A protein has these predicted regions:
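Nucleotide/pyrophosphate-binding catalytic subdomain
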Residues: 1-125
Length: 129
């Protein structure tokens, strides 16, 4: 069975209706027998909104905390995508970066990443988000 990585940017997951549309595209690939890994961005405009909240909170913010706040948008979208796929009877779960794990350099806001291999459980054929 082939592996397919599908990436959805902020505009394509901008709201719940668009997440459902993206999930239908994932479902089509699953129906064709593919193992799918889904990567999602934050919903359109959410990263800027989160960054504005940081700026409203602190004039001289810590880059580590800025990254923690701003990256939460992707986590929300991943959870919503997993829930949408589950509603379609497709086994799915979201993963946070630390669960994969995704390792980074310590250069906050401009870190380089190193991604470990993700294990997809063959018996469940779970969609990984």
């Amino acid at each position: 069975m082939s592996l397919l990585v599908m990436k959805f940017g902020g505009t394509s997951v901008a709201n719940v209706d668009r997440i459902k549309r993206a999930a239908k595209r994932v479902a089509l690939e699953v129906a064709h027998g593919k193992n799918v890994i889904v990567i999602v961005s934050a919903m359109s405009g959410k990263t800027n909104e989160l960054a504005d909240w940081v700026n409203d909170t602190s004039q001289f913010y810590d880059a580590r905390e800025y990254d923690a706040v701003v990256s939460s948008g992707e986590n929300v979208t991943a959870g919503l995508m997993a829930l949408t796929l589950q509603e379609m009877d497709i086994p799915a779960r979201s993963w946070q970066g630390w669960q994969v794990p995704v390792r980074t350099t310590s250069a906050h806001s401009s870190a380089r990443i190193e991604l470990s291999l993700i294990h997809i459980s063959e018996p469940t054929r779970q969609i990984v988000i």
